[in-house]
């Protein structure tokens, strides 16, 4: 079983659906939800070798961490996210490699 990180994208952090929808989805994930994560504030900074720039083009709006047997399973679980009903909402799924 591996760990997978969900990075959420919506218009703004407040566009991500209501707490009841998120609670229902998290409840459905059961013990596979390792860390419900947090929403991000609107904006962020990208640090480059040459400096720092504000993230303006579709910044991430939050994260969660789940466990799954495969990328396919983690991706299938993400399809139930409340952001799927939000215009331009998206969930990016990344596998966290063991160190």
State each model region's role.
Residues 1-99:
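Conserved, structured core segments of small domains
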């Amino acid at each position: 079983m591996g760990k997978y990180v969900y990075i959420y994208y919506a218009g703004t952090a407040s566009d991500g659906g209501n707490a009841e929808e998120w609670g229902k989805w998290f409840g459905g994930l059961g013990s596979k939800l390792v860390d419900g994560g947090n929403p991000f504030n609107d904006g962020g900074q990208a640090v480059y070798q040459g400096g720092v720039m504000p993230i303006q083009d579709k910044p991430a709006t939050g994260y969660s961490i789940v466990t799954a047997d495969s990328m396919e399973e983690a991706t299938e679980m993400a399809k139930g996210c409340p952001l799927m009903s939000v215009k331009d909402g998206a969930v990016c799924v990344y596998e966290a490699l063991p160190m």
